[in-house]
């Protein structure tokens, strides 16, 4: 077996990591930064430590704070225009998956013809573009350290998944001190996204020993610490442990790939502007139960990682307990239990089927699915 591991050149972790990053970048003399973020994060004061550190080092920057959830190609073009107008030299993304994915797409345009969605698929970005620093505020998408970006093509109403090592940030930052004020609902959704990353990577056809180790530890940490991070958001230990867990999950899926959960979740996210983590969380137990017959022994290990006492159980019984444990965690952190609660109807499903099957995440799923089977999975998730 041969496989590739692609990671950021530098990763910084722990409270105070933002200040450490600024000192590091100051020595590189990259020039002027475009800070790509969400205006709400600016209003909450979450970027104050970054601004202060940059000002202290007398480092030039321009703020672009127009990012919204589920970013579109139009937003990417707007951000790239801001980058050009301010004569910037590199990018700093601050936020969760949406700001970081937007910055990754802008990075593409700094060295390749647009639009960024033209690079949907695997390995199509020819030139790396300018340096990118990614400061993560959620736990999480792991966008700060992965090769993935997801941008909506508004005309086609589809999430275009761009996967290329050239998108991996040069520096990844996970500073739990800026995660303390993330609302419970966002904490829950992003945490379940991270769990989805870990489980899909572990049962992926691309899994290997290095991704297995990262995925199992990620599952253990997320199952243990997500409820506390949701219920007691200012608990720094819970936030740090979730940051570690989601990063390990990112290390796993960045090499092993994902699966049908993400392939199906991308579609309601695109057409109904639903939170990505919520879509994943709703689909996760349903699709993994569909996958279970093809990976019984692996799901038994997922159950162990989620704290199930599997002693004396057959792998078959333990694998079913893994699905139950996923459902239990999802309910505990307040995830809606079906898409119908979010305005989705049966009529919406037909338009998603072909797009889900064509999604770049689908090929790594341990069990192939037909169009009819995808329809049934969506119906079960209503």
What is each residue range found by the language model?
Residues 271-348:
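Gly/Pro-rich interdomain helix-loop hinge
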